[in-house]
Amino acid sequence: MPDKRKIEMYKSMFLSIAVLLSGTSLACADPAADALATHLYAGTLDGGKEALAALPDDAGKKSAEGILAFVTSIEKLGQGLHRHGLETHPGGMMMQLPVLRMPVPANPSPEPITYEKWRGLLEALLADMAAADALLAEGAKGEANLPLDLLKIRLDLDEDGKTSDAESLGGIMAAVTRQPLPEGSAAKMEFAFDKADVLWLRGYIHFLSAALQFGLAMDFEDSFNATAHAWFPRSGLPFAEALLKPTAPGAGFADNSIGDALAFVHMMNWKVADPARLSDA
């Protein structure tokens, strides 16, 4: 008859291996986890904010609110880019810059964009991420367990009150990388979103914020007016009609794209307009 102690040892080993292989945690998810996942997957971010506000205050709730606030900041940026008619062409050299690589639905009637409006979009993103970071800082004081599949998160980028597969993070990732997502159960990007993940997200926000502060410290109006038609071709920019030629998706680097990129680089002798932002970066 097997030794009882060996049986218990084998049972413990089997349980440990099963947990490791399954990629799940025995820890119970926070009460905020269901509300967070439900609304992120549905793209109903305002509803998620209301649902989380109704829960008791604890570290899990604050972390969930911070995650939701960060995703909302990305949605608001995407809505602003769509409103002004951002067009991303995979073959364009000017499409390699951060923020402007974000694919948004086509807008047949974009609002005009100016240098001041562009700075306003970046300043709003900076403020929204700071608010998200403040919530995450509160959440990081305790533990959290907020399982999420990032590829299922949906955004309403064109402000039509609906979401599509192209507006999911999975769809956005596929468009940016130009690689289709795996089919079936392989198409997952699951995170436990525990305290370590919350701290990582705070670090990522700080990195993005530093880059934004550095850019906003500069006066880059001449560069914007001369080259931003590469991103916003139908938004009333000065040289759009004279310089822009249609670029078919996947057509490689068009002549106008190379010219815009060279002009952008050669005009980067920007003056510091707001020195205080450099110390904040």
Regions found by a protein language model. Name each.
Residues S63-E65:
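Alpha-solenoid helical repeat scaffolds
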Residues D58-K61:
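Residue-level recognition of tetratricopeptide repeat
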Residues F14-S25:
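Bacterial N-terminal signal peptides
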Residues M1-E8:
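Short, Lys/Arg-enriched N-terminal segments with co-localized hydrophobic residues
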Residues P31, A35, H39-G47, F70-A281:
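Short coil/linker segments at helix-helix boundaries
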